[in-house]
Amino acid sequence: MSVGVLRKLRVQSLRKETTEGLVVALEIPQAFRKSFGFKHGQFLTLEKKINSEIVRRPYSICSQAVSEPSSLEIGIKKVPGGLFSSWAHQELSVGDELDVLPP
């Protein structure tokens, strides 16, 4: 697996922690688990086409560090005027797929 390759990951769950904080759990398919192993402090880069624009944003991983995770959680803070964060808070649903770069 190449570390720099976007992978489609399914949204497993969404949890509102605060009015501005959203925790997104992403399911990691077995074939990609080694490439999504991480150390504390690393992040995932998410890519999404929003309003005809390809948007890439890094989000910190807030899961327990493991070498071959079956899922990962990231935190997305809603930023006023933020294209990706606003979309995630308003449109993202369980079952959606996101393009994600490994840590």
What does each model-found stretch correspond to?
Residues 2-97, 101:
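Ferredoxin-reductase
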